[in-house]
Structure formats: C-alpha cells, structure tokens
Amino acid sequence: EISAGVAPGSDYPVFDTRFGKLGMMVCYDGFFPEVARQLSNRGAEVIAWPVWGCNPALAGARACENHVYIVSSTYEDISRNWMLTAVWGHFGEPLATASEWGTVVVSEVDLGAATHWNSLGDYKAQLPRHRPEWGVSP
C-alpha cells in the first residue's frame, strides 16, 4: 500500500454527515480499543468498520465500550462464523445481521438514544474523564 501512495495516518477524523457523526476504523484498527475510543471522544456516533475477518465479539465490544453504533462490513463467508456484516448497538448486540454472503444490512438506529446506565449515569459523557486522551488536558 505504501508503494502505491497510501500512507498511515496520525489522526482519527470524524465527519459530520446528514445521518450523524461518522468515524471509520479499517480492518486491523478494530483489534485495538484505543481507535474506537479516539473516534468516540471526537464525537463519532457511528463507526464504519470494513474488516476482512475477526471474532465478531470485537465489534460488539467496540460498540459497548464507547456507546456508538458499529457498522461492520466483511468479505468473509458468513458460514465460517469468522466475522459478520452487521449493525451493532450500544450494548454490543447485533441489531441487524446479513443472512448470507454478499447481502446488504439495513437498520434504523436512534442517535438520540440515552446513553444512561443505571449504575453509571450518562456513560458516554464519562468516557473522556475516565480514559483521557494521552497528552491532552480536559
């Protein structure tokens, strides 16, 4: 990729779109919780994640850890149970899942849904306080 002019980035951009604030992880990025956290801290409400394959539990974990929707898209054959094309909710559950290879998944989500957990209060508002970005003052 580097020889073709693609270089690694050093930022985690979030884009304002007509359907919400969108961040993106690419494949291996999703294996590290810090990537989704940086996107969430920057205001992402939805994180798109094209990924060749991995344990589907990672998509649920990234959604739950950061109270964002994860939209995973994979080339993997669903029958291998290696990754899913799906929309994942705030609690880490798949809201919609592709039933076969090569299909599209659609799910309506509520970006205004409360991020309140009974024992923690407004969970998403607490994230920057508990896991601040390294080197940045609140």
Language-model features, listed with the residues they occupy:
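CN hydrolase (nitrilase-like) catalytic-core segments centered on the catalytic cysteine
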Residues: 30-105
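Active-site catalytic loop in hydrolytic enzyme cores
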Residues: 1-42, 119-124
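C-terminal beta-strand edge segments of enzyme domains
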Residues: 14, 76-138
